[in-house]
C-alpha cells in the first residue's frame, strides 16, 4: 500500500467535516458569550442575545419601530446638514459616507410620535453615525426637539448613545452641551417631563450634559456610561478602579440612575412612567 493512501482517507474526512459557510447576515455571533444565533431570531428578540441577554446596539430606526406606536412617528429637521467649520481633512466625506450607510442626516433622529396613545417627542442617537458624536447639527436637532415638546406640552424622551463631543467641530460641539441643557431647563420650568434613557455607550460631553439631567434617568443593562476613559482616570487618581466601574449597574448602586430596565421591559415601563406624569394619570398601577 502506498504511503499516500494512508493519509488520503483522513484528508477526505477532514474535507467532508469542514464547516459550511453560511450566507452573509444569516447568523450573528454574540460578542459577550460567543453564542451563534439566527439573525432573524436576534431581531425578533429586539437585538438581545437569546443565551446571555447581551444587549446589542440598535439603529435609530430600530428603536423607533420597537418603542413607538406603529405608524405614529413623524421625523423633524431631516434637512439640517453639517458644515466643516474647522476645515478638518476628509470630514465632509466621512459625514457623507455615514449618511449613505445609515440613511440619517446626522447622528440623532428626532420627531413626534405616540407611546401607547400618549403624544411624546423623542430624540434617538445612533452610534453607527460618527459613533453618535455630538456636533452642531446634533445639538441643534436635540434643542429643537426639546422646544417642540415644550410647545406641545408633552414629555420629551431621549435615547443616548454617543462617544461624546465631536472633535472635528471643536468648541462648536462643546457649545451644544450648554444649548441643549438650557432648552431642557425651560422645558422643566413648564412642569413637563424629561426621561433620559442611557444606552451603550454614553460617554464624554453627552454624559456630562443632557444625558444625565433627566427627571428620570434610566439605562439598559451593562451600558457603558461615563465621562473620561478608565485608563485616563486610573492614571489621574493613581488607583485601580472597580471592574464594574462606569457600568449602568455601578451607577445605579451609587445613586446616579433611577432604574435599569432590560429592553424587553423598557417600552412598558416608560409608557407607565409617561402616563403617571400626564394629565389623567393611570387608573391602576
UniProtKB/Swiss-Prot annotation:
Residues engaged in binding Zn(2+): 30, 33, 49, 52
Any single GO BP term: fatty acid biosynthetic process
Catalytic activity: N(6)-carboxybiotinyl-L-lysyl-[protein] + acetyl-CoA = N(6)-biotinyl-L-lysyl-[protein] + malonyl-CoA
PROSITE patterns, per the entry: COA_CT_NTER
Domain CoA carboxyltransferase N-terminal: 26-285
Region (Disordered): 1-20
Single GO MF annotation: carboxyl- or carbamoyltransferase activity
Comment on bound cofactor: Binds 1 zinc ion per subunit.
Pfam (any one): Zn_ribbon_ACC
Keyword Transferase appears in the UniProt entry: yes
Keyword terms: ATP-binding, Cytoplasm, Fatty acid biosynthesis, Fatty acid metabolism, Lipid biosynthesis, Lipid metabolism, Metal-binding, Nucleotide-binding, Transferase, Zinc, Zinc-finger
Recorded GO CC terms: acetyl-CoA carboxylase complex
Top-level taxon: Bacteria
Compartments where found: Cytoplasm
InterPro entries: AcCoA_carboxyl_beta, Acetyl_CoA_COase_Trfase_b_su, ClpP/crotonase-like_dom_sf, COA_CT_N, Znf-ACC
Gene3D superfamilies: 2-enoyl-CoA Hydratase, Chain A, domain 1
Record-annotated membrane-spanning stretches: none
Cofactor(s), by name: Zn(2+)
Assembly and interaction partners: Acetyl-CoA carboxylase is a heterohexamer composed of biotin carboxyl carrier protein (AccB), biotin carboxylase (AccC) and two subunits each of ACCase subunit alpha (AccA) and ACCase subunit beta (AccD).
Chain's role: Component of the acetyl coenzyme A carboxylase (ACC) complex. Biotin carboxylase (BC) catalyzes the carboxylation of biotin on its carrier protein (BCCP) and then the CO(2) group is transferred by the transcarboxylase to acetyl-CoA to form malonyl-CoA.
Family per similarity comment: Belongs to the AccD/PCCB family.
UniProt xrefs under NCBIfam families: accD (TIGR00515)
PANTHER family: ACETYL-COENZYME A CARBOXYLASE CARBOXYL TRANSFERASE SUBUNIT BETA, CHLOROPLASTIC
Protein name from the UniProt record: Acetyl-coenzyme A carboxylase carboxyl transferase subunit beta 2
Organism field: Lysinibacillus sphaericus (strain C3-41)
Amino acid at each position: 500500500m502506498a504511503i499516500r493512501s494512508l493519509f488520503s482517507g483522513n484528508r477526505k474526512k477532514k474535507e467532508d467535516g469542514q464547516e459550511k459557510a453560511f450566507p452573509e447576515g444569516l447568523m450573528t455571533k454574540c460578542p459577550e458569550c460567543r453564542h451563534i444565533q439566527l439573525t432573524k431570531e436576534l431581531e425578533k428578540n429586539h437585538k438581545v442575545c437569546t443565551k446571555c441577554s447581551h444587549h446589542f446596539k440598535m439603529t435609530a430606526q430600530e428603536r423607533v419601530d420597537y418603542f413607538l406606536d406603529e405608524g405614529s412617528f413623524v421625523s423633524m429637521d431631516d434637512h439640517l446638514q453639517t458644515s466643516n467649520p474647522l476645515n478638518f481633512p476628509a470630514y465632509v466625506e466621512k459625514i457623507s459616507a455615514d449618511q449613505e450607510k445609515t440613511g440619517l442626516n446626522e447622528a440623532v433622529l428626532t420627531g413626534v410620535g405616540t407611546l401607547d396613545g400618549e403624544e411624546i417627542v423623542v430624540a434617538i442617537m445612533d452610534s453607527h453615525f460618527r459613533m453618535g458624536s455630538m456636533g452642531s447639527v446634533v445639538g441643534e436637532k436635540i434643542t429643537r426637539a426639546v422646544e417642540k415638546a415644550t410647545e406641545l406640552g408633552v414629555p420629551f424622551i431621549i435615547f443616548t448613545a454617543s462617544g461624546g463631543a465631536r472633535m472635528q467641530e471643536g468648541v462648536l460641539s462643546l457649545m451644544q452641551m450648554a444649548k441643549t441643557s438650557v432648552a431642557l431647563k425651560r422645558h422643566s420650568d413648564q412642569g413637563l417631563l424629561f426621561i433620559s434613557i442611557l444606552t451603550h455607550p454614553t460617554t464624554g460631553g453627552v454624559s456630562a450634559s443632557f444625558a444625565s439631567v433627566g427627571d428620570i434617568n434610566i439605562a439598559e443593562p451593562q451600558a457603558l456610561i461615563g465621562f473620561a476613559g478608565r485608563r485616563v482616570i486610573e492614571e489621574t487618581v493613581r488607583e485601580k478602579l472597580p471592574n464594574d466601574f462606569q457600568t449602568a449597574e455601578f451607577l445605579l448602586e451609587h445613586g446616579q440612575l433611577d432604574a435599569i430596565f432590560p429592553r424587553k421591559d423598557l417600552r412598558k415601563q416608560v409608557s407607565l412612567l409617561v402616563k403617571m406624569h400626564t394629565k389623567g394619570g393611570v387608573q391602576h398601577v
